[in-house]
Design a protein with these regions (language model features):
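Generic recognition of stable, solvent-exposed alpha-helical segments in well-folded globular domains
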Residues: 7-14, 44, 55, 68, ...
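Flexible, solvent-exposed extracytoplasmic
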Residues: 113, 118, 124-268
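Short alpha-helical segments and helix-capping/turn motifs at coil-helix boundaries
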Residues: 41-52, 105-110, 127-130, 137-138
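Extracytoplasmic/lumenal acceptor-recognition loop(s) of multi-pass membrane glycoenzymes
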Residues: 16-36, 49-119, 157-159, 163-220
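Catalytic cores of large soluble enzymes that bind and process phosphate-bearing ligands
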Residues: 36-41, 247
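Active-site-proximal structural scaffolding
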Residues: 12, 39-46, 106-107, 115-116, ...
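Signature aromatic-anchored transmembrane alpha helix within multi-pass, membrane-resident enzymes
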Residues: 2-22
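Transmembrane alpha-helical segments
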Residues: 1-2, 157
Length: 268
C-alpha cells in the first residue's frame, strides 16, 4: 500500500540522514583531535596568567596559540575570532592590507601595527619561542615562562593616547603602499581636506621625503617620538576609558579605539 511505502521511505531517509550526519561530523572533527588537544590546558593556564601579568591597561598579541586567549586574560588582543566587532574594524584592517572576516589575525611581519595599536606584551607557548623569534622583528624582549606561556615585551610599545607632529591628506594616504601604511600611521595622522583646514594649525603636513622613509629603524624612532608625547594614565572599564595627558601646546590625541555610532568622547 502507498502508506506502507511512504513509511518505509521516511524511515530510510531518516536512517541515512542520521548516519551521514554522524560520519560527516566525525570526519570533520578528526583534524581537531590533534590541534585542540591542548585547548583546555591553554585556557586553564590563561586563567592563571591573568593574575600574573603586569598591571595596567594595554593590548596584547598572541602567536600560534588558541583563539581568544585575550578574553580569558581580560585584555584587548590583536588575534580575535568572533563577529562581535566594531564595524569600523572592517574598513581599518583591509585598508592596511590585513584580512578581516570573522577573524582578526594580522601577521607578525606587520611589526608597525603593534606599535600603532599599543601592544605591550606578546604571549606564545615555550614550544613556539624559536619559531616566533625567527619570524618576528628585533623589537621583542623575552621576559619569562609564566603559567605555561612564554611572555615577551614589545620594545616599541607606545601607550594608548599619543600625539603627532605631522599629518597627511587622504589623497596621499590612498597612494601609499598598503603594507607600509602602519609605518606611515606611526608618523602622521590622516586628514580629509576639511579636517586639514580645521586642524592643520596643530600639525605640519608631512614632507614628501618623509613619506617614503618607512624602514624598521625609522619606525623605532617614530615610536620614540610618539611615546614622548603620550598619555601618562589610561584606565579602561566596561563603559569606556579615562586618560590623562600633559602637553606644552594644544594638539590632537590619537586613541586606537572604535568611534562608531553610539560612542561618545568628552574632553575637559
Amino acid at each position: 500500500p502507498p502508506s506502507r511505502f511512504a513509511q518505509r521511505m521516511t524511515a530510510a531517509v531518516l536512517v541515512f540522514a542520521c548516519a551521514f550526519t554522524m560520519v560527516h561530523i566525525g570526519i570533520g572533527k578528526f583534524g581537531q583531535w590533534y590541534t585542540d588537544s591542548d585547548l583546555v590546558e591553554q585556557d586553564t593556564n590563561a586563567l592563571l596568567l591573568k593574575n600574573d601579568l603586569p598591571e595596567g591597561d594595554y593590548r596584547i598579541d598572541t602567536y600560534k596559540i588558541h583563539d581568544n586567549i585575550g578574553m580569558w586574560l581580560d585584555k584587548s588582543c590583536l588575534q580575535y575570532f568572533g563577529s562581535t566587532a566594531a564595524p569600523s574594524i572592517l574598513s581599518f584592517y583591509p585598508g592596511l592590507g590585513v584580512k578581516r572576516d570573522v577573524r582578526s589575525e594580522p601577521e607578525i611581519a606587520n611589526y608597525a601595527l603593534r606599535g600603532l595599536l599599543s601592544v605591550e606584551y606578546l604571549i606564545t607557548t615555550p614550544e613556539k619561542r624559536e619559531s616566533f623569534e625567527d619570524e618576528a622583528d628585533a623589537g621583542w624582549t623575552y621576559l619569562a615562562d609564566v603559567d605555561g606561556y612564554a611572555l615577551y615585551h614589545n620594545d616599541n610599545y607606545v601607550p594608548m593616547g599619543f600625539t603627532y607632529d605631522y599629518y597627511v591628506t587622504e589623497a596621499t594616504y590612498q597612494t601609499s603602499i598598503k603594507t607600509l601604511r602602519s609605518n606611515l600611521l606611526m608618523r602622521a595622522l590622516v586628514f580629509s581636506d576639511e579636517d586639514a583646514a580645521v586642524y592643520g594649525k596643530y600639525l605640519a603636513e608631512l614632507p614628501t621625503e618623509k613619506q617614503s622613509e618607512l624602514t624598521y629603524d625609522a619606525y623605532v624612532q617614530d615610536c620614540n617620538d610618539r611615546r614622548a608625547q603620550a598619555c601618562s594614565m589610561f584606565q579602561m572599564n566596561n563603559a569606556g576609558f579615562h586618560a590623562e595627558i600633559t602637553l606644552e601646546n594644544a594638539n590632537l590625541v590619537f586613541f586606537s579605539v572604535p568611534y562608531d555610532d553610539g560612542f561618545t568622547a568628552y574632553v575637559n
